[in-house]
Amino acid sequence: MMFRDQVGILAGWFKGWNECEQTVALLSLLKRVTRTQARFLQLCLEHSLADCNDIHLLESEANSAAIVSQWQQESKEKVVSLLLSHLPLLQPGNTEAKSEYMRLLQKVLAYSIESNAFIEESRQLLSYALIHPATTLEDRNALALWLSHLEERLASGFRSRPEPSYHSRQGSDEWGGPAELGPGEAGPGWQDKPPRENGHVPFHPSSSVPPAINSIGSNANTGLPCQIHPSPLKRSMSLIPTSPQVPGEWPSPEELGARAAFTTPDHAPLSPQSSVASSGSEQTEEQGSSRNTFQEDGSGMKDVPSWLKSLRLHKYAALFSQMSYEEMMTLTEQHLESQNVTKGARHKIALSIQKLRERQSVLKSLEKDVLEGGNLRNALQELQQIIITPIKAYSVLQATVAAATTTPTAKDGAPGEPPLPGAEPPLAHPGTDKGTEAKDPPAVENYPPPPAPAPTDGSEPAPAPVADGDIPSQFTRVMGKVCTQLLVSRPDEENITSYLQLIEKCLTHEAFTETQKKRLLSWKQQVLKLLRTFPRKAALEMQNYRQQKGWAFGSNSLPIAGSVGMGVARRTQRQFPMPPRALPPGRMGLLSPSGIGGVSPRHALTSPSLGGQGRQNLWFANPGGSNSMPSQSRSSVQRTHSLPVHSSPQAILMFPPDCPVPGPDLEINPTLESLCLSMTEHALGDGTDKTSTI
């Protein structure tokens, strides 16, 4: 199908929609354009409206609180018409005029629900208000409840009147009712139609919240009456029949407080069925999709549904779908109570939101734990829990702070170029990090570069502090510290797998910047390189070692692994205690002479009889890739034999003559082969007595 044909089809649909539907659809499409496209469209619209004096006059009226307040003296038809034509022109930030609109909107919606009149117009007004940039979180939450009341009113069939047609451009004769309260045509033409009622009773002069409503709502802020008005409607447990009313009379404050909502008592508050996003009508589906922050790029809310599901709070997703990230982070129990969230649920939501606010301090604590020898597996589990929570890009979350602090971070390197390993040692001293955590000057993308294989003491600059609220940068910093420990400590397959999974999630997460993702990618490549240093067969044998870990020496593996005499080995063991399956008993028996202490032969490289410091660093940069394979040399010693575990030290000693032969393993380079050979000869040269003590 040609492009012009597609445009023709879209134009045909567009002509069939009413003005409100067209507006919602256009806004939904505009949210998908780039900034350049949006600016171009703005220029086109401004140019076309430059000579349109009528729209300027209408906009002036729409933003005058005094004029809007005078509409209360008009007929209901006139008020609905004025709201539809002026509400879209309200300027964001005009709180005084907005309050007047909300007061009128409250009265229109209450009357519409009570009398089954102006249903379609009420839907359109709700649509405009829900997508309007001038409305706040409280406004939208209250309006979403009004919309659910309106649709429940139609679905419940409380009265026998037929449901009106969806398009407001159809004739008003379809709006049944003894009082003949139908509106005219939708759009600006309503202003030209005279009211069908010759007489009317004006609005009640009270513009404040009725006492009956004030007694129920828990929100002390009564600037916007509609914020708490749905509460009495929702809490009502019985259907109170309405008293006969003069056709032109708006409901009094007492009636508004006493009348019940048209819903069943067992209907759960804020259920997905009553949300805007799950509405059954076409127009509200469009509106729901345009207002659903779960689907907006850069909103930070895309992970909220899965996060709520993990908390078993997914039934309240509709409440969060109308919020921005910043609004969600400021939720309180009092606000949730005003939205009729049950006591247990609002307490759980409030606690979960509080945990979201504490993520940065948790990440700082994790960073210190990793540096000071904490359990790496526990740290990775904490990171897994944090990455599934809603995270917003810091540059979007605090754009002004980010713009002011972009310059100090230029030292991190040019974007798009992953830093060279060793450019800045990532293994920071705990004291240094403690000093920087006490300060919170704003910064952007403050995370360490890819970890160096062997950090050099004394040459390490103090890491830049991470700004408050910059979760992606803090998360990336911890990932850098974890990568360092993975490279210099005894390898653990589960830890490495968990780390790679975390990196994959970060690489596809919208909150992380391109620079952060490139650094994470460089760390991923280093960890993958670590895994590739072992033969494939050794990796396959790992499962056999796990199953047979108790055959020869059982639980002796951990005490032996902890009896390291070398300082580096002690630090490594203290940082990351290995599980019982960490070292295969047979291989530990081969590597337990006095100079090694029963641990990985890579620790033996610190011995003066072996290679120099440079070769030691090379070895530490390329350790093994699983927790049952502490070094490459062990795999080369055992690789040519099919027995995964030897049952006695005597059986172990039968194999050393073949150890120097690397076999057909092409993955081990000659340098590592020579290291394996010299290490094995050194271990066997101490005799068999100490070997048999395992």
Curated annotation (Swiss-Prot):
Pro residues bias (residue ranges): 416-428
Compositionally skewed regions (Polar residues) per UniProt: 215-224, 624-643
GO molecular function list: mRNA binding; RNA binding; translation repressor activity
Bias (Basic and acidic residues) ranges: 158-172, 431-442
Spans traversing the lipid bilayer: none
Residue numbers of Asymmetric dimethylarginine PTMs: R602
Region Disordered, residue ranges: 158-301, 407-471, 607-643
InterPro entries recorded: PHAT_dom_sf, SAM, SAM/pointed_sf, SMAUG/VTS1_RNA-bind, Smaug_SAM
GO BP term, pick one: nuclear-transcribed mRNA poly(A) tail shortening
Tissue expression pattern: Widely expressed in embryonic and adult tissues.
GO cellular component: cytosol; nucleus; P-body
Residue span, SAM domain: 299-372
SUPFAM superfamilies to which the protein is assigned, alphabetical: SAM/Pointed domain
Phosphothreonine modifications at: T407
Keywords, sorted A to Z: Cytoplasm, Methylation, Nucleus, Phosphoprotein, Repressor, Transcription, Transcription regulation
CDD domains per UniProt: SAM_Smaug
Function: Has transcriptional repressor activity. Overexpression inhibits the transcriptional activities of AP-1, p53/TP53 and CDKN1A.
Family affiliation: Belongs to the SMAUG family.
This protein's name: Protein Smaug homolog 2
Organism: Homo sapiens
